[in-house]
């Protein structure tokens, strides 16, 4: 009788030990099982179950985290759905490379204003940003990692005194 109770206690202890694994659910449907070490501003640092090395995932790639010990569910980010060019306003520009960790790199894109235009420095910048976001939306990518932001004004631009804004980035998706 004592052996049966001991075996039952060991089996229950094993199940409880396994149940304390944190589960990270990504927006693309993948789940990652391990131990969340910490949640930073743009990233989540975790260790895979049975490993000691720390891994990093950007928060934009993560839907939620279910903590194994407490059972608490933490919603990290909502999924951004960009299906047509009309969804360009939903596109997010990332300025920190670590925020793109865990997302799939798509292609390099560019948005710019014309050489001769009637934009001020600020409105030209907004126009270039809009074109950049529209390019990302056209290929179905909700994120852009900004790689270059160049503005030329006056005689350095085109010799005609106009201004031109050029923004380049890498488009990312889930």
What are these regions (language model features)?
Residues 19-152, 161-174:
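Compositionally biased alpha-helical segments
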Residues 1-21:
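Bacterial Sec-dependent N-terminal signal peptides
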């Amino acid at each position: 009788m004592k052996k049966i109770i001991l075996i039952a206690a060991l089996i229950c202890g094993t199940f409880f030990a396994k149940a304390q694994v944190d589960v990270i659910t990504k927006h693309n449907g993948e789940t990652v099982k391990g131990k969340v070490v910490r949640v930073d501003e743009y990233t989540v640092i975790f260790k895979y179950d049975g490993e000691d090395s720390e891994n990093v995932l950007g928060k934009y790639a993560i839907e939620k985290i279910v903590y194994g010990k407490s059972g608490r569910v933490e919603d990290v980010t909502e999924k951004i759905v960009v299906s047509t060019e009309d969804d360009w306003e939903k596109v997010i520009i990332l300025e920190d490379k670590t925020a793109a960790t865990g997302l799939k790199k798509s292609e390099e894109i560019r948005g710019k204003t014309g050489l001769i235009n009637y934009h001020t420095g600020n409105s030209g910048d907004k126009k270039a940003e809009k074109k950049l976001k529209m390019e990302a939306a056209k290929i179905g990518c909700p994120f852009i990692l900004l790689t270059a932001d160049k503005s030329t004004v006056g005689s350095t631009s085109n010799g005609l005194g106009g201004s031109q804004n050029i923004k380049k980035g890498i488009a990312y998706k889930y």
